[in-house]
Amino acid sequence: MITVTKEKNCITVKGHAGYDEYGRDIVCSAVSVLTYNLQESINRLTDDTVGFCYAPGEAVISFGDVSAAAKLLIDSFIVGIEMMSFSYPGNVELTKH
């Protein structure tokens, strides 16, 4: 199960989807693409400084006050994760605090 936790100044992505074997897991791939796209979009399209920390099975995205553009990108990431959790409820879980 991949758990995505959205807090005021942090998003944590943890775990493995377990949808298919390693290298063939489309759910894991989709969440990874959403996460990497968020990082690159904020870096390329805004002047905001956002922290990204990656480790095997975990990504932590930390931010303070961000521009409207970065907030929109973060909100778009959350929409993508919500869609994944609706389509694959046994593999992706979103929690908002």
Model feature map: region roles:
Residues 29:
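DNA-recognition element of transcription regulators
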Residues 1-26, 35-97:
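N-terminal intrinsically disordered, cationic/polar leader segments
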